[in-house]
């Protein structure tokens, strides 16, 4: 009898620990709030981006602008994106899970690019998800810029 109770307690503890670990890592898909990190609006919520998966690869598109008119177009974008509406535009593409987990940042995704619609430039990208926090880092050669995005709960 004592052995059965002990085994039951061990299973409950293990499942609870596993659930906590999975929640801490989080899931990438969903709605995320970006924060302006430059200029006069620094520190203000800037936009909502929808991160979505297609065939195991993640992308992000603009869902809503919070500091600009909803009909704003990408004046600084290059090629086919120039003059296109920002709402619905895919800014991040080809992000794949690496299998690495950083103890501070969480589960890592890499291999893709992120485009900054303010200047129209694209950068190599790595992201880490941990719970309701997403760390986004764009790289240009040995230089990088990091932003934190926050999950928007429906």
Tell me what each language-model feature is.
Residues 65-68, 142:
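Acidic glycine-/aspartate-rich tracts in secreted/extracellular proteins
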Residues 32-37, 110-117, 136-138:
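Short beta-strand segments that buttress and anchor functional surface loops
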Residues 1-4:
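Positively charged n-region of N-terminal signal peptides that target proteins for export
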């Amino acid at each position: 009898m004592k052995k059965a109770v002990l085994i039951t307690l061990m299973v409950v503890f293990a499942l609870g620990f596993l659930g906590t670990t999975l929640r801490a890592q989080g899931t990438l898909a969903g709605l995320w709030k970006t924060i302006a990190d430059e200029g006069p609006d620094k520190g203000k919520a800037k936009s909502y981006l929808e991160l979505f998966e297609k065939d195991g690869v993640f992308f992000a598109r603009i869902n809503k602008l919070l500091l600009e008119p909803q009909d704003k177009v990408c004046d600084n974008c290059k090629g086919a994106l120039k003059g296109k509406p920002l709402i619905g535009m895919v800014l991040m593409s080809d992000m794949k899970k690496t299998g690495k987990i950083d103890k501070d940042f969480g589960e890592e995704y890499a291999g893709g690019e992120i485009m900054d619609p303010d200047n129209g430039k694209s950068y190599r990208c790595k992201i880490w998800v941990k719970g309701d926090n997403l760390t986004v880092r764009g790289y240009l050669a040995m230089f990088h810029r990091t932003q934190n995005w926050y999950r928007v709960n429906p």
